[in-house]
């Protein structure tokens, strides 16, 4: 099977175009791609397949060629904006602030896609500032390249349904250089020393036998065989999953490859994905024999088996599970939810029911911070471990209330999930607690998302009442969720962007953890601003013609922006401290 896969994939690799092997010819396929613009907005070329073409003009901040071409480019955009999508492309990876300042000073308002790693410009074979390229967003072929003076004729040809008469014209302008590419292609990139460590660190934990990914990246042969796919998912930013804007904040789980890592992988693929040395680091990786992230749990809570039919829409299920075996109060330091059948369990919410509780608890937090945080199941989420010296008290006799969301897959199955819980040593009482709040919108203030709206915004604000350290951010929307940003508005009138989830993906609902907790003063407002894509361009959209209400099911929508923090003066609550 692997040999056949390798043969097929190498044939596909040979068909890919890399500008390092020579200049790109007219109508040659470059592949799909995605980039963030100077405002941090995500643009995926395939999303624009309802346009006749995507038009790109090469921009650099100090380029006279860009300045000279800009007025005509703007005029053409004004004449053709209904049928064509216009961008500028910065192939030098210049800083976002400097590009934004350039856009502001020139007053054109055209989104500038910033190619930090030069991998898109290289694939497009961008050669000079001021150069214009026309990309077919369905075939991903460059149908015209040349000066702006030839653009009108090219667009008229495309508008008439004809091939571009003159697909390539010479262009003058400052030469675009590729120092990292040229340096890499002048040597042989080492699979064992350079490539395998990147794949091991960023891919192999999911792409392994028994992992959640669809194939195991456990050898050079597999990496080489899948190299065309690796290139495609890097170009479109589909993998690693759950990526956020790397220019905003510093997170432990941003899942963004560095510029150097992206270049190393793609240049290695361009060289033929060759192996060096006698050993294969990927084949030597060893994984724990258990899925439990922190060793064998101190307590395993078994969720009652849930029978899932082959078809149909399932109501949310409410289950209450006792913490069997907990005969004395214990402080919780970590927890993990292992789904019995990931194909049907979409997500869970949970809440602790203390002894004597009547069950009327919120699934959205905001309860006593002395209570423990038991992790829910969210696609792609990592097991939860409290910050150092932080925890909540699980009282003997407590129960766990679970809300389970299942989807059907065409086959009957039974989900038998488990929740692992790890305690602090007996007698140890952590000094700190976690708090937080959700910037949520519910039915009383919900505004239905209009039909066919590609970018419908919502926003909600929460206030941090005391000095606090921010720890994490969790966005939650459904199929139409597009993006979400969190911004701090400080009491002195200043503001700061905290995180930009530029390409929200319903399949990867992650809680993003700051590498270093961020101190904010009392009275800080945190604004979560998100947008929904209810257009037919959103391929996951169940019904673009529908006015979308708030609702629990995935074809309805939600808006949650959860924030976790730790108050500076937050120690044990009076009730617990007194015990």
Q: What role is predicted for each listed range?
A:
Residues 31, 53, 108-111, 126-133, ...:
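Structural micro-motif
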Residues 115-177:
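Thiol/selenol-based redox catalytic cores and closely related redox-interacting motifs
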């Amino acid at each position: 099977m692997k040999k056949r896969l390798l043969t097929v994939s190498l044939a596909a690799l040979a068909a890919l175009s890399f500008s390092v092997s020579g200049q790109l010819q007219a109508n040659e396929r470059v592949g799909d791609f995605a980039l963030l613009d100077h405002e941090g907005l995500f643009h995926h070329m395939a999303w624009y397949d309802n346009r006749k073409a995507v038009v790109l003009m090469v921009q650099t901040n100090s380029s006279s060629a860009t300045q000279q071409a800009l007025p005509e480019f703007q005029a053409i955009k004004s004449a053709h904006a209904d049928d064509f999508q216009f961008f500028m492309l910065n192939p030098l990876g210049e800083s976002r602030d400097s590009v934004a300042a350039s856009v502001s000073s020139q007053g054109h308002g055209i989104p500038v896609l910033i190619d930090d790693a030069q991998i898109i410009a290289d694939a497009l074979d961008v050669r000079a500032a001021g150069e214009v390229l026309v990309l077919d967003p369905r075939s991903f072929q460059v149908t015209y390249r040349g000066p702006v003076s030839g653009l009108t004729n090219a667009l008229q040809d495309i508008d008439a349904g004809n091939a571009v008469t003159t697909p390539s014209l010479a262009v003058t302008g400052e030469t675009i250089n590729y120092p990292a590419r040229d340096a890499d292609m002048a040597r042989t990139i080492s699979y064992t020393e350079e490539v395998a460590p990147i794949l091991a660190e960023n891919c192999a934990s999911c792409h392994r036998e028994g992992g959640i990914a669809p194939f195991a990246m456990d050898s050079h042969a597999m990496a080489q065989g899948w190299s065309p796919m690796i290139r495609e998912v890097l170009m479109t930013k589909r993998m690693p999953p759950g990526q956020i804007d790397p220019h905003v904040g510093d997170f432990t789980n941003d899942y963004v490859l560095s510029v150097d890592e992206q270049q190393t992988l793609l240049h290695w693929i361009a060289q033929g994905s060759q192996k060096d040395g006698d050993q294969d680091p990927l084949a030597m990786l060893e994984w724990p024999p258990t899925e439990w992230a922190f060793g064998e749990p101190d307590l395993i809570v078994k969720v009652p088996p849930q029978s899932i039919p082959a078809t149909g829409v399932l109501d949310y299920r409410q289950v209450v599970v006792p913490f069997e075996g907990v005969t004395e109060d214990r402080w919780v330091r970590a927890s993990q939810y292992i789904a019995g059948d990931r194909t049907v369990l979409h997500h869970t919410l949970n809440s602790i029911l203390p002894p004597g509780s009547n069950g009327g608890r919120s699934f959205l937090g905001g309860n006593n911070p002395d209570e423990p945080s038991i992790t829910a199941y969210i696609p792609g989420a990592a097991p939860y471990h409290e910050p150092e010296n932080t925890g909540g008290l699980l009282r003997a006799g407590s129960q766990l209330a679970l809300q389970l969301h299942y989807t059907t897959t065409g086959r009957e199955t039974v989900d038998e999930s488990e929740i692992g819980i790890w305690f602090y040593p007996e007698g140890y009482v952590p000094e700190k607690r976690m708090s937080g709040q959700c910037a949520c919108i519910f039915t009383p203030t919900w505004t239905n998302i209009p039909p066919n709206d590609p970018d419908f915004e919502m926003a909600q604000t929460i206030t941090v009442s005391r000095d606090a350290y921010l720890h994490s951010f969790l966005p939650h929307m459904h199929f139409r969720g597009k993006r979400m940003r969190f911004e701090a508005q400080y009491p002195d009138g200043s503001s700061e962007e905290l995180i930009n989830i530029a390409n929200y993906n319903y399949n990867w609902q992650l809680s993003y953890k700051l590498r270093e907790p961020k101190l904010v003063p009392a009275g800080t407002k945190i604004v979560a601003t998100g947008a929904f894509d209810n257009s037919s361009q959103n391929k996951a959209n169940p019904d673009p013609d529908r006015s979308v209400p708030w609702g629990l099911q995935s074809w309805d929508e939600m808006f949650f922006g959860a924030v976790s923090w730790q108050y500076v003066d937050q120690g044990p609550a009076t009730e617990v401290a007194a015990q």
